[in-house]
Amino acid sequence: MKTLLLGMAAAVLLANSPCMADELKVLSAGAMQRGLVTIAGKFKEHSGNQVQIRYATAPELRKILTENGAAADVILAPNPTLKELAGKIAADTQKEIGGVGSAVLARPDAPSPDVSSLAAFKRSVLEADAIIYNRASSGIYIESLLKKIGVFEQVQSKIVQVDDGEAVAARVKSGHGKEFGFGGYTDVLHNQDQGGVKLVGPIPEEVQNYTMYSSALVAAAPSPAPARAFLTYLETPEAQTIFAASGVVSKKK
């Protein structure tokens, strides 16, 4: 409650300041999209500031801020990405949001692969007609997992790699037979909301991987005052509840 009141106080101060008209620019990993859209709307209600969100993969986030340090006011990204951008974000402003695990998606009309245990998961992978994952961090983990459980060489010819989570969903939608894809849990929920794919479930907990995400103020932020208020709002119970509902876990498991 105390944190929420602090966030509201910051919003009230903004409502009476010249920065009220500023458009807040947020650069974010796609995994945060499902919750961030709602949060941006709530923040506008509280502060009056419009929030413009640009989504990108971790490599793209690095490239954008490296080439233009003033491209955004706030960034939400995987912790390793923020570490690499240490010179581009304001010191002591990084705050952890939570983690996103890996999940399986399939066509709504397709049989759901069994991912209830590691043995069942391994069997489903071996029996699949095609396996789709991205070239971003979540896809890199899935490939390492397939190698770890000893099936990569057997299924390598069935693997389809695409650029990002949206591309995974598009490929799954257009597929046939016993095909399924992998993505961040929040990405899969978002794509299920859009229609054409279904969430099968998270991968087995014993091989689950949580990518931890944090927010930070961009050092060269064009609108630092509303940006700081937005970062404060992200720590409120209201924002944390929204993130949790979108599939973000509050802490690393």
Regions found by a protein language model. Name each.
Residues L5-N16:
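Bacterial N-terminal signal peptides
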Residues S17-A21:
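Sec/Tat signal peptide C-region and signal peptidase I cleavage site
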Residues D22-A71, L76-V100, L105-K253:
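Exported/periplasmic ABC-transporter solute-binding proteins
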